[in-house]
Amino acid sequence: MDAIIIFLILFIVGVLIGVGVYYYKEKERKKTYKIIEMEIIENLKELKPYVAPDEGREYTKEFDLVEIALSYDIEDIIVVNDEGLVIATTLKDADEVGATASSIFEYIKKLCGNIKKVVIFKEDSYLYIYPLKLYGENLYVIIESKIALDVIEEKEILKRITGVLKKYFSTITTIEQEIPEEALLSI
């Protein structure tokens, strides 16, 4: 009988020690995660001036282009037609930037001939201007980034932007198909 009582006492003590060790290790692991989390936050604070969007700008509520911009650390994406009118953007006040960038591209195209893109290095950012032809429309994609984009990223970004623009243009063609021609003639 004494052996059973001693066994039970030792068993309970062993379980309590095991649970105590488990909670101690768990507490240490959480402390380690907290330290790592604080280090990451500090490092992100150091990186913020280099990749964070400008706080003085107002962004649109359209999430298609904003999602692309966030996934590639891009500040702004503006798509304009050949007249400089904004088609899609991540900014609310992109009219002036879009018109200026499209005219810059046209001016450089007159000087240099057949060009694929224009890259302007500003004080703290890069401005990329790409020509794009979609459904017979001449468009310009203007990308502002605090980091330089490599060629692979550029192609991926332009491919995703083209996918978003196809949604916009498919909506327009669907609307045109739904409106009878008599209604168009009366306008």
Swiss-Prot record:
SUPFAM superfamilies from the UniProt entry: Roadblock/LC7 domain
Segments passing through the bilayer: 3-23
Keywords for this protein: Membrane, Transmembrane, Transmembrane helix
Subcellular location: Membrane
Name the UniProt record assigns to this protein: Uncharacterized protein MJ0163
Membrane topology: Single-pass membrane protein
Annotated organism of origin: Methanocaldococcus jannaschii (strain ATCC 43067 / DSM 2661 / JAL-1 / JCM 10045 / NBRC 100440) (Methanococcus jannaschii)
A single cellular component GO annotation: membrane
Coiled-coil positions: none
Pfam families membership: Robl_LC7
First-listed, main subcellular location of the protein, grouped into a coarse class: membrane
